[in-house]
């Protein structure tokens, strides 16, 4: 049974710049989540990377490939890794070209790393991942069909990499109502988002109380734990 989900997005690994700094931060992150998850079994942990693992679309380098695959391999030792693509991981205007994540997945050939590319519902133990795939224009998966197939006793978690109406950027720009509305995620119990680098949180149905300790963690840049 999955008991803990670690959520990160917008890693933006460059082709060769700042790799020493990236690796130092990655190692700190891995050490932190390893300590946090020490009371969980490997199969109880999921690490969700919600788009933009790399930065320069399909321009990749040997250095980038080495660092990216090292990061994914180390994460997979903590728990199963779930990845979706973001706008920096592919050419949106030419999807016939291979994206930058696929070669890593093929080379790693790791059963503890899953790469979801379709807008559909993926069963994973007691969780159903509802992927709004960028390869299919962030189309809403058929969550109703997924619930009929997999049951309502699962937790349905959306994966989405694109702006949301009402989200704000670090410079204060707010995305207007022409962008995706929260009802696009109807049927999901929660949604893990990527793309906008300023951390935001939306509550569509009921308000969640956050204690002071949680709030201080939430305000920081970095990663989030969902239990």
Predicted regions and their residues:
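N-terminal active-site segment of His-dependent metallophosphoesterases
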Residues: 1-71, 149-152
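Low-complexity, intrinsically disordered short peptide segments enriched in small/polar/basic residues
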Residues: 2, 140, 154, 214, ...
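His/Asp/Glu-rich metal-coordinating catalytic cores
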Residues: 46, 58-209
